């Protein structure tokens, strides 16, 4: 069954619900969702959950504050008939502006990656060359706003996007290159905007899996 695409906010909430279940073993409450996302009221979280339910991503169970059941793991949105969307470019060196539209589709099933890939981004630069992410590669990305230390992430810093290895340390976030000639990007989220756009789950080079 084909499901409707999610808005950015709906995707953020869906990812948080999944992450909360994976890390705690139970769904979050509306209060916990509101606190995490920044809503002033749990009612706002409730409305977004209803939208997710209407689109077929979750089931809302009555009679409990944690009555949320995941129905889909985004696999169906990744594995569509057109293949994976190729969205803009990502700098693996100096960050460049992300292009927020689909340039084309690539004939590959996102479910072949683990976790599944939701889109592809073209790499520009060699800052991740030590781990085999090279200039011109297509980076398979699982769309999520949550990542662990050490994962290779697609991160938006202000209005630019880059691929780096994530490290959260104290109040700062370090985006480390895999190139000895380059320095990490250091972000203070108290004064700079940063958002995780996804985690790298694979690389396609010259039409072949890497």
From Swiss-Prot:
Gene3D superfamilies: Umud Fragment, subunit A (2.10.109.10), Winged helix-like DNA-binding domain superfamily/Winged helix DNA-binding domain (1.10.10.10). It catalyses: Hydrolysis of Ala-|-Gly bond in repressor LexA. Residues 30-50 bind DNA. One of its GO terms (biological process) is DNA replication. GO terms for molecular function: DNA binding; serine-type endopeptidase activity. It comes from the Bacteria. The record marks 92-93 as: Cleavage. Its EC number is 3.4.21.88. Keywords: Autocatalytic cleavage, DNA damage, DNA repair, DNA replication, DNA-binding, Hydrolase, Repressor, SOS response, Transcription, Transcription regulation. InterPro entries: LexA, LexA-like, LexA/Signal_pep-like_sf, LexA_DNA-bd_dom, LexA_repressor, Peptidase_S24_LexA, Peptidase_S24_S26A/B/C, WH-like_DNA-bd_sf. Pfam families: LexA_DNA_bind, Peptidase_S24. The active site is at 127 (for autocatalytic cleavage activity), 164 (for autocatalytic cleavage activity). Homodimer. NCBIfam families: lexA (TIGR00498). HAMAP family: LexA (MF_00015). Represses a number of genes involved in the response to DNA damage (SOS response), including recA and lexA. In the presence of single-stranded DNA, RecA interacts with LexA causing an autocatalytic cleavage which disrupts the DNA-binding part of LexA, leading to derepression of the SOS regulon and eventually DNA repair. PANTHER family: LEXA REPRESSOR (PTHR33516), LEXA REPRESSOR-RELATED (PTHR33516:SF2). Belongs to the peptidase S24 family. This is LexA repressor. It comes from Actinobacillus pleuropneumoniae serotype 7 (strain AP76). The gene is lexA.
């Amino acid at each position: 069954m084909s499901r409707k695409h999610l808005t950015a906010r709906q995707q953020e909430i869906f990812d948080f619900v999944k992450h909360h279940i994976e890390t705690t073993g139970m769904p979050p409450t509306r209060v916990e969702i509101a606190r995490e996302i920044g809503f002033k009221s749990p009612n706002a979280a409730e409305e977004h959950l209803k939208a997710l339910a209407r689109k077929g991503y979750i089931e809302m169970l009555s009679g409990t504050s944690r009555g949320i059941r995941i129905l889909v793991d985004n696999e169906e949105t990744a594995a569509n008939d057109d293949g994976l969307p190729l969205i803009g470019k990502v700098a693996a060196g100096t960050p460049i502006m992300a292009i927020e539209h689909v340039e084309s589709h690539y004939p590959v099933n996102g479910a072949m990656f683990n976790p599944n890939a939701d889109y592809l981004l073209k790499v520009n630069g060699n800052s991740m060359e030590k781990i085999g992410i090279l200039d011109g590669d297509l980076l398979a990305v699982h769309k999520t706003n949550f990542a662990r230390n050490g994962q290779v992430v697609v991160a938006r810093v202000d209005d630019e996007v880059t691929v780096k290895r994530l490290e959260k340390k104290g109040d700062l976030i370090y985006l480390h290159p895999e190139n000895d000639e380059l320095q990490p990007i250091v972000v203070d989220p108290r004064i700079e905007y940063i958002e995780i756009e996804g985690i790298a789950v694979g690389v396609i080079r010259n039409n072949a899996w890497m």
